[in-house]
Amino acid sequence: HEPAEKLIRWNAVAGVVALLVGGILALLVTTTRWQAIHLLPPDWFYLVLTAHGLDMLVFWIIFFEIAVLYFAAAVLLKCRLATPRIAWVAFWLMILGAIINNVAVFRGDSSVMFTSYAPMGAHPAFYLGLILFAVGALVACFVFFGTLVVAKSEGTYNGSVPLVTFGAVTAAIIAVFTIASGAIILIPTF
């Protein structure tokens, strides 16, 4: 289970790093909204708010979800990860997408928060980062589904899957539809 354990750790750590960055940005947003301090100028406020929202509501949650999916399949069902190399490609696509997106925001031309469609267009790198992240997350979800098939075919469990794994299956199905819809909507903007 070593490839799965490494991927679980790396995805969880990436999620915690995104949470930390988003938390620091939340402090900047809070101190700006506090009239006594008013830390950031208006143009930086929306820039920081955009990065905070993406790091906290997209990157942290999805990195952590992928870690949970791999745990629920490989560890709880005691089987090997279906395609570890493809899982690593998915992870690095997600990392690359998150970095590109944050760089695009902090360059100052992508402070659109979650309204990144006309007329509030952002730099193409902003959309590229989100699309790469989404593709990586989708690939990771399919690795999870493949791992479930491996577990069933190798007979690593009897009867139905554990409740946590069932919950992970439900979360992965919702994630696939949500992430795919989001990525498809963003493709024309890129």
Predicted regions and their residues:
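Membrane-embedded and interfacial regions of multi-pass energy-transducing membrane proteins
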Residues: 1-190
